[in-house]
Amino acid sequence: VDRLPFELERPQNAGVNSIMLFGIPDHKDEVGSGAYDPNGIVQKALREAKKQFPDMYYITDVCMCEYTSHGHCGVLCGHDVNNDATLELLAKTAISHVEAGADMVAPSDMMDGRVRAIREALDANGHYGAPIMSYAVKYASAFYGPFRDAAGSAPSFGDRKSYQMDFHNRREGMKEALTDVEEGADIIMVKPAMSYLDMVSEVSKAVNVPVATYSVSGEYAMVKAAAKMGWIDEERIMCEMAVSAYRAGAQIYLTYYAKELAKCMDEGRIG
């Protein structure tokens, strides 16, 4: 939290007006209690950020994996995630984020029914206008590796394929997107971006809400590594990746290149 002024001043000066916050707590436990602690890392960061940079738009990741000692996205029952028990904790997390100053919450856990649970909980606590960006079309992808290493959120056993989608599957992605809109999602996200632009295109034609896509850590790392070796033009690749997402139908693009893209847009190198 003490680094917030430095970390937020740079994107704001670059012309970035929206950021997403992820939390890595000092202590993790079986039920991820740090996720919904009113004095948790994200909650503290939101309160401080709102004071120092009130014009920035703050979106928060709502999930348990960074907070659980086992690295899974919910409460365990044996070696399986208990979907319904997890919904209650996700709703508590979303409420705590909004009450700390979040402008939007983004559940990324992939539990069934979590958008409805969060929407009902927010409304019951008077947060009727708080929007939800749902990670509706989230695939079990190898592209997440660098983020999981940085956040220390890799599962200690098994994997997340029981609640994230098989990357072969198109129909399930469409079904999830439509279901989450019915449950109250204001924005639908497709994740990852680069290898799933077909889904960005299809979802954008099927839903009546904005579509976001997330260019994840593995995509960023590949470009960085290839650029370091002198094999590619990093800036041109970065711009092509962003434009391809918008061309496919995305209206929101989440990226680790936000500052650099903002500069390119400001200088008229991309539209």
Across the structure, where does each feature detected by a protein language model lie?
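Alpha/beta enzyme core
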Residues: 1-271
